[in-house]
Amino acid sequence: MAFLKKSLFLVLFLGLVSLSMCEEEKRENEVEEEQEDDEQSELRRSLWSSIKDMAAAAGRAALNAVNGIVNPGEQ
């Protein structure tokens, strides 16, 4: 009976150690994913900012071109 008790405790202990290691690895993976998400968000923000700046510059250029056509001598 004592042998079975020791074996059962050993199995439970090893199971807890294994579970603990899996939980730690899972937390590490979640942290890595959060860092990747943050990097992707920063990249998207900078991309949208660049697109917005280019669109504004194109709009100003188009407005200047239209003003040049409509009012050719007033620049």
Curated annotation (Swiss-Prot):
Keywords: Amidation, Amphibian defense peptide, Antibiotic, Antimicrobial, Cleavage on pair of basic residues, Cytolysis, Fungicide, Hemolysis, Immunity, Innate immunity, Membrane, Secreted, Signal, Target cell membrane, Target membrane. Residues 23-45, 74-75 form a propeptide. Expressed by the skin glands. GO terms for cellular component: extracellular region; membrane; other organism cell membrane. InterPro entries: Dermaseptin_dom (IPR022731), Frog_antimicrobial_propeptide (IPR004275), FSAP (IPR016322). The keyword Signal applies. Residues 1-22 form the signal peptide. GO terms for biological process: defense response to bacterium; defense response to fungus; innate immune response; killing of cells of another organism. The modification Proline amide is found at residue 72. Pfam families: DD_K, FSAP_sig_propep. It is found in: Secreted; Target cell membrane. Its main location: secreted. Antimicrobial peptide with activity against Gram-positive and Gram-negative bacteria and fungi. Has been tested against E.coli (MIC=47.50-128 uM), S.aureus (MIC=189.98-512 uM), K.pneumoniae (MIC>189.98 uM) and C.albicans (MIC>189.98 uM). Probably acts by disturbing membrane functions with its alpha-helical amphipathic structure. May penetrate bacterial membranes, but stay at the mammalian membrane surface. Shows a very weak hemolytic activity. Belongs to the frog skin active peptide (FSAP) family. Dermaseptin subfamily. This is Dermaseptin-SP3.
